[in-house]
Amino acid sequence: VTTIALARVADFAALGERWRMLEAQADCSFFQSWTWTGCLAAERFPDPVLLEASQAGDTVALALFNRRRFLLRQTLLLGETGDGVHDTPYIEYNGVLTARRAGDILRDCLRAARRLPVAGMRPWLLRQLVMSSVEDATVEAARAVGRVAIRNSSPAPSIDLARLRESG
């Protein structure tokens, strides 16, 4: 059984320790690591919301969102601020940090992000999710649970130098 909760972040240093522990159990991109996510986190996330999924008491997924509010509507931005100045260092391979052993919980995590209360306050309207540069599986899971906006989606090209050298 997977338990999912949303909470405000009060201590980024403590979150960083937990995040790095989960990183060791995940196949994640650099852009999902605490090195990227935690860099200037207090400045980049003025209204941070942490999604945490656990199974048998162990954390199996974490996602750091920034919450933006406009009237009754709340928006959660995955791994970004929504502010062009702070989001200029562009995230390329974004997503929910998930342990290898967690199974297929992505859809449940994103559904929870739209619906669950934060600090005891349930949203008046279902939240919109905003994501940039997420994998196709994340896009599909997000669209399956409702309103989602996919922003920038242009990962930087890369070359496998070892393979290039081998080919001559």
Identify the meaning behind each predicted range.
Residues 1-168:
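N-acyltransferase acceptor-side catalytic subdomain
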